[in-house]
From Swiss-Prot:
The keyword Mitochondrion does not apply. The keyword Ribosomal protein applies. This is Small ribosomal subunit protein uS2. It comes from Pyrobaculum aerophilum (strain ATCC 51768 / DSM 7523 / JCM 9630 / CIP 104966 / NBRC 100827 / IM2). InterPro entries: Ribosomal_uS2, Ribosomal_uS2_arc, Ribosomal_uS2_euk/arc, Ribosomal_uS2_flav_dom_sf. The lineage of its organism: Archaea, Thermoproteota, Thermoprotei, Thermoproteales, Thermoproteaceae.
Amino acid sequence: MTEEMQYEYLVPLEKYLSAGVRLGTRLSNKYLEDRGFIFAVRPDGLRIFDIKKIDERLKIAAKFIARYRPERVLVHTTRPYGFKPVQMFCKFVGCKALTGRFIPGTLTNPNLPHYQEVDLLFVVDPKLDAQAVAEAAKMGIPVIALVDTDTPHQYIDFMIPCNNKGRKSLALIFWILARQVLRERGELKPDQDLPVPPEEFETKLVQS
């Protein structure tokens, strides 16, 4: 039996594939390539992430997040498809959700009414959430981020390579992380799932 067959994924491999979690962009990213995160390049130029690497990073990220008091963890996204996944993750884990525009000074100016004092920042896309990442770096706050092949890696302390743009991908990623954080805390048994499926974390399309 090969090592790949023995490896136990957090969810069945088919779930990762159907959610498009491994799909990157057509942009090259030497930083991610050098670290073995990119598995292949399709004929059309689309980068494909190594699902096992994604799974491994999710396990580590869950352990990392579980070490912090949830009320001191801020999860931020300006990407609309990330709003529902972030809100659901924070609902189950107890973290603070900040969706939409990040007001300058949120992490750096205690005189502002919207100031947030946090110990860990988690962002969906460092490119779109650059203001939050920059303020966290200035304040010495560690940053976890979902990174695609078009994502800058500066100031990111721990990256989870994945498709950080798709509705289904973001829903599955945050569902897995919520479940794993609760398992790490002992609030769920090692084989216990969340009471809702990943689809409940998914942003619904509005019919016109």
